[in-house]
């Protein structure tokens, strides 16, 4: 088998996809994996800006058929790289229209597609997840409750939903991602830093918080990332 594809989705802006993507890239690189990062948020490519110096990175528009073709060809040309896709906020239309391009080639690529679907506590990120699962039925899907929006029990809409049952019956997990102090996340975004660079360059208190968050994120990712 070639290495897996990890798609970090959510289809809404502001649910925390970028930070989950950064944590995923950081976790894989710490384990010695070669990573190919695909940034599909071409209007606000914050993960690309933070990682383009240290990681092989491509900007691809997945709202168009050409982007999906380019994505599949890249996945085929780099079988030894784990592919991490940061999906754009508006991406469900592109997935619904063209996702079959990737879905139908997974067997030939010899890759698993694993989706980390980041949610807040609102209904629309759940509705968008159902659309995504219908569009790419071959994907393994794990739901990531972003702890920035509250502790696990506050995600009542998802926790009690039929969608959660459907995700878990398909073998998916429901996990809760740690919150990062705003001061540190603001630094990472405004200074366009990767996590590893931030751990060297931020002030000592900020680095202590980032280390705490990184260790908590690692515990979550260990349960859903298997290379």
Curated annotation (Swiss-Prot):
The keyword rRNA-binding does not apply. Pfam families: CbiA. It comes from the Bacteria. Keywords: Plasmid. Coiled coil: none annotated. This is Protein MobD. It comes from Acidithiobacillus ferrooxidans (Thiobacillus ferrooxidans).
């Amino acid at each position: 088998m070639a290495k897996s594809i990890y798609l970090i989705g959510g289809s809404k802006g502001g649910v925390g996809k970028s930070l989950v993507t950064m944590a995923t890239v950081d976790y894989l690189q710490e384990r010695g994996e070669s990573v190919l990062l695909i940034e599909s948020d071409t209007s606000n490519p914050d993960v690309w800006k933070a990682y383009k110096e240290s990681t092989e990175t491509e900007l691809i528009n997945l709202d168009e058929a050409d982007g999906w073709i380019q994505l599949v060809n890249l996945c085929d040309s780099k079988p030894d790289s784990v592919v991490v896709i940061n999906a754009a906020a508006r991406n469900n239309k592109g997935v619904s229209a063209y996702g079959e391009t990737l879905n139908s080639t997974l067997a030939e690529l010899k890759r698993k597609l694993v989706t980390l679907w980041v949610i807040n506590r609102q209904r629309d990120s759940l509705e968008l997840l159902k659309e995504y699962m219908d569009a790419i039925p071959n994907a393994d899907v794990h739901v990531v409750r972003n702890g920035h929006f509250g502790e696990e029990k506050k995600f009542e809409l998802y926790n009690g939903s039929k969608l959660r049952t459907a995700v878990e019956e398909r073998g998916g997990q429901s996990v809760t991602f740690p919150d990062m102090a705003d001061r540190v996340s603001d630094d990472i975004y405004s200074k366009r830093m990767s996590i590893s660079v931030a751990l060297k360059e931020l002030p000592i208190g900020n680095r202590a918080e980032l280390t705490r968050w990184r260790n908590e994120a690692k515990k979550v990712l260990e349960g859903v990332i298997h290379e």
